[in-house]
Amino acid sequence: MKRKLTICLLIALIFYNGNAKAAERGSLEELNDLSDTVFQMTRQAKYEEALQVLEYFEKTLKSAEKKQQDPMLTGAQIRQITLGYNDMVRSLKQADTSDTQKLRAAAQFRMLMDAVDNRSDPLWGSLEKPIMEAFTELKRDVQKNGSTSFHEKWNEFISLYDLIYPSLTIDVSEDQLETVGKHIDVIEQEEFQQMTESTKLERLSLLQHDLKNVFDRVEEDDADPSLLWVIITTGSIIITALTYVGYRKYKAEKNKLKKRDYPK
């Protein structure tokens, strides 16, 4: 009798855990879908509608957190989602924010939520090719001693890296991101231009190698055509307008609070 009771309890526990996991998966999937809706609304310049979806997104996130006995998101994930959400709302509400900046914020938020929901083949992984191909041109400019062209290509690279950086904080270890960040800091220093050609190429190769390691952790997947459209159509504009402001901000927030969990 005791054995039968134990078996029944185990089955009930397994069934409960299965339902909890399914509910958690459903909530994350819904949040991911909502971020895509925000992206599509922003792409069509339907900003009021996008804000309404974001309002529902916030309510859904809070509701999902309250319903789960075990938090479906870590404190770090909640913090990154909150940062992305606030950026998205702010960009849509500010009158002086250009359509390009709004669309970029939407693409960034879209990839962030996909990274939270999709751990095997996140959307940010599909941007490996344009990001890694930048090194060929950067090295070519170093060899030709074309400083102006190098800076343009570098800002282009940083602009793409900025686009996926929030997503990387979800999927990539802090140590890996810090290593990549240190390489970027070195190249951005004025002293970099005073280095010999061989040293510059070595620094670029180190960054290239560690970034390749970051991308190697995800499965290859086809790029989202909508996101590629954003990159292609806004690329030349965002280089000068945005450079790497977002990257700096997320990096500063990460370093500032890396040992403190987001309060619940």
UniProtKB/Swiss-Prot annotation:
Keywords: Membrane, Signal, Transmembrane, Transmembrane helix. It is found in: Membrane. This is Uncharacterized protein YpjB. The chain crosses the membrane at residues 227-247. The lineage of its organism: Bacteria, Bacillati, Bacillota, Bacilli, Bacillales. It holds the Pfam family Spore_YpjB. GO terms for cellular component: membrane. It comes from Bacillus subtilis (strain 168). It is a single-pass membrane protein. Residues 1-22 form the signal peptide.
